[in-house]
Amino acid sequence: MEKMTINQLPSRTWNRLGVNEATIDWDESATVVLPEESAEKTDMLIASDAAYARKRVTVQAEKGAKKSLFQILRTAGKLHVQTELTAEDGAEIELIQLVAPGENALVYDEVIGHCHGSGRIVLRQVTLGHGDVYAQTGIGLDGENAAFAANIGYLARKNKTLDMNLVVNHWGKKTKCEINASGALNDAAKKIFRGTIDFK
């Protein structure tokens, strides 16, 4: 069993705030690696009953194309899903996620995006369930007029944790970014939201 450091801020702030990063317990030796997929379909259920599981998904939209993928993430243990999106010039990828861990379970939802030329990525994410959710989104707006938009809704219950980290790097000219997040915390649930827009 080791500590995995995730959701790190690009530039550290005061340690006493407790938001520089998050750590989760993870047993790499016990991790079940689920088959990697290059998403050609439009919907995908990613579910596991293993104590520790990991899955990687890649989506590529060629020049001028438009793709949409709906994912449901469920687990009874601990699940790490890495989804990598690449939008070429003039392409658009829409990723819709329902993140719903079971009772006392944990989902680490990692989204990596690359927007080339005027490529665009849209993330629509809803977080529900009875477990802990750690969400890491890292987007590179590499081309002129590249764009990213995120709309996030959440509900956390009991004493569970919702920890979100979004980092958008603006490398190209005339790039656009919009991030919206709203939701509710019930009982003793806690939330950390980090949003970084970095003009390179």
Where are these regions (language model features)?
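Short, Gly/Pro- and small/polar-rich lid/capping loops
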Residues: 1-29
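Conserved beta-strand/loop scaffold segments within soluble protein domains that form the structured core
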Residues: 26-200
